[in-house]
Amino acid sequence: MASLYQRFTGKINTSRSFPAPPEASRLLGGQGPEEDGAGPKPLGAQAPAAAPRERGGGGGAGGRPRFQYQARSDCDDEDELVGSNPPQRNWKGIAIALLVILVICSLIVTSVILLTPAEDNSLSQKKKVTVEDLFSEDFKIHDPEAKWISDKEFIYREQKGSVILRNVETNTSTVLIEGKKIESLRAIRYEISPDREYALFSYNVEPIYQHSYTGYYVLSKIPHGDPQSLDPPEVSNAKLQYAGWGPKGQQLIFIFENNIYYCAHVGKQAIRVVSTGKEGVIYNGLSDWLYEEEILKTHIAHWWSPDGTRLAYATINDSRVPVMELPTYTGSVYPTAKPYHYPKAGCENPSISLHVIGLNGPTHDLEMTPPDDPRMREYYITMVKWATSTKVAVNWLSRAQNVSILTLCDATTGVCTKKHEDESEAWLHRQNEEPVFSKDGRKFFFVRAIPQGGQGKFYHITVSSSQPNSSNDNIQSITSGDWDVTKILSYDEKRSQIYFLSTEDLPRRRQLYSASTVGSFNRQCLSCDLVDNCTYFSASFSPGADFFLLKCEGPGVPTVSVHNTTDKKKMFDLETNEHVQKAISDRQMPKVEYRKIETDDYNLPIQILKPATFTDTAHYPLLLVVDGTPGSQSVAEKFAVTWETVMVSSHGAVVVKCDGRGSGFQGTRLLHEVRRRLGSLEEKDQMEAVRVMLKEPYIDKTRVAVFGKDYGGYLSTYLLPAKGDGQAPVFSCGSALSPITDFKLYASAFSERYLGLHGLDNRAYEMAKVAHRVSALEGQQFLVIHATADEKIHFQHTAELITQLIKGKANYSLQIYPDESHYFSSAALQQHLHRSILGFFVECFRIQDKLPAVTAREDEEED
């Protein structure tokens, strides 16, 4: 049981409180303490892989396995070959026997050489992945953040920091901003004006929530102009909530104190066009906490018309939303608190309205009319997208999130016309995705769920076309099948092609496809076999769809290349991340395997990470990593180097992930299974994955652990008390980072989406609590980690959990991060967090490794 010192000092997982992390070989009972001076040895170098363990598992110094291959003495050979009469030796027989032995030995040696994988020798020379690697420049993926600005040109940032304009057709480059200038301004973000005359920089940026921030902004003429501060007329040196260019010339807006300011061009005084804002209460053009985190998934809540003459913006009113306070314990004699509006399940939600203002001439503010539908008494606005310069598409979603109405609103009158309606018995998924419009706005493509047989609905492209002199639209499905379209990228009118990403290849992959929008809707994969060691792509097309930027995201090292749409031919590489490729080629990277398991008529994918030196004859600890947020995906062919990589590479663990019921991209039947049953079905599926792994001879059944963060922290807490077939605990230990422990304490939009409206029927909320689960803990080590100023999942969740753990006399440890937010923005804190988690599991696996020896000593003493 963790000591009181460990529980409350915050040092339970530091390098002083845990012994130095052992090598993978030590975790597996290989190198003994007496060999420490020899330095770490790779796992595969300790004993021949084919050598069987001697039964009883005991023997040799340091607890190392003994092997049955032993040399026989000369006397043994004499007795066997000659008999008991010494003078009568058969020298010829001895010579023949020795010759046979030599031949057999040579055959064995030859076989070992031929059958040993060629990589084994090189593996022993490679380094193991460490926590330091995660934060080193060698492993930092560079994303050029390329953005198309014309049919043939895009802007990107090179590794040295300079901002480059690249012409695809002429293959020429122009430096717009030197990297040194960005460094001198201490700028964190930059943006180029549409006419390429000015650059906008932000510096001294201070994060607010996941996406939002405040910062100082300056404007500078390209390439070498002096910076000039961007401020509202009434304030100098103001810290702004947002600033950004419009679609034309040098027009820009910025937001200060939740009010919107407009500037027609650089040098002209900004005018306040929206002035109803109230700090922390009424947001104009920006999201409040709930919309930023759960609905729009961005802090930006304003949208320019294509011609720059109008601006649509949301007004979000939090005045009736209950206030949460985030305490600050350090830096003052008395703790202080930061209040903000946070709606929990069943509480008052923010109200929202959508407005359009004209930017040419006198400001005219017009509110778009919401649907007149009794199911929409409370609603969210989940998507806004301009179709033309006077028409704007808006998606309205009921608070219960089971009814949505897509409308097309007239920006000159405020009248909204219904274009599509969707309804679900569970919840509506993927509600903030934007449709793609034709130039005249009469045709648009959007993704909707379509029935595809026994697996329920899958998300496919539908085209809606307005008919002349008719109020009814013609709707057709472009794609179909038991796979999902994950994103519509572009519509090429001149070629009648739609471009999109999908899971048609496999759910864990993302390939780029095109489909004809006429005739039989013929479909073609553009990215299949296009890039070596890459099956997970994203892409962006030039405005005319003649070229596209193709971003490989895995399983190999991410790259970015430019292609011609006509023949898919690669024109050039924009980024290859060779430094990362070199770094991982020098490391013992995990081996990745994929399997499927069967449970309750479902085939569920699992991902297994094994040490590079993996052998079937060794015994490895098993770590189950859970996420499982409904609609998410854990098993994907994406490149990542994380603390899990360190756990596998440096500490010889096997890591497994499973996409069970509630996960995305496998049909709505599997997705919606967890409705009003959070926790129970996920437990069943994750435990089935563990049971499958425990059948493998290379898994040590005494060293099994579970980890999760956020919703995954909820699941890891839910799973930890699980029992095996013999009613013994399956897990030796577990850890939860920022766990949700009671959904009535969490965000309204999230909890109500999956458990229903709180207050109408609370049984689903009560059943989902982890309190009734943790009372069944039987001595398993449990590490709970939480930041005290977590704005997303309040420390209140962990406080409630600890209360239950104390009542149940559980063996828990608590690690807090004082005054830190949910996202751990500091690299130093992230590094400490990773070390803490790794140290906990290394110690857990080491203790379990010693238990059999301790038991044996106790038995000897009793005898």
Swiss-Prot record:
Coiled coil: none annotated. N-glycosylated. GO terms for cellular component: plasma membrane; voltage-gated potassium channel complex. It is a single-pass type II membrane protein. Keywords: Cell membrane, Disulfide bond, Glycoprotein, Membrane, Signal-anchor, Transmembrane, Transmembrane helix. Glycans are attached at N171, N402, N469, N533, N564, N811. Residues 1-93 are cytoplasmic. Gene3D superfamilies: alpha/beta hydrolase, Dipeptidylpeptidase IV, N-terminal domain. Predominantly expressed in the brain. Isoform DPPX-L is expressed exclusively in the brain whereas isoform DPPX-S is found in brain, kidney, ovary and testis. GO terms for molecular function: potassium channel regulator activity; serine-type peptidase activity. The keyword Transmembrane helix applies. Residues 115-863 are extracellular. The chain crosses the membrane at residues 94-114. Residues 39-51 have a biased composition (Low complexity). Residues 1-86 are annotated as: Disordered. Disulfide bonds join C409-C416, C525-C528, C534-C552, C733-C844. GO terms for biological process: protein localization to plasma membrane; proteolysis; regulation of potassium ion transmembrane transport. InterPro entries: AB_hydrolase_fold (IPR029058), Peptidase_S9_cat (IPR001375), Peptidase_S9B_N (IPR002469), Serine_Prot_S9B/DPPIV (IPR050278). Homodimer (in vitro). Interacts with KCND2. Identified in a complex with KCND2 and KCNIP2. Forms an octameric complex composed of four DPP6 subunits bound to the KCND2 tetramer. Interacts with KCND3; this interaction modulates the channel gating kinetics namely channel activation and inactivation kinetics and rate of recovery from inactivation. Belongs to the peptidase S9B family. This is A-type potassium channel modulatory protein DPP6. The lineage of its organism: Eukaryota, Metazoa, Chordata, Craniata, Vertebrata. The gene is DPP6.
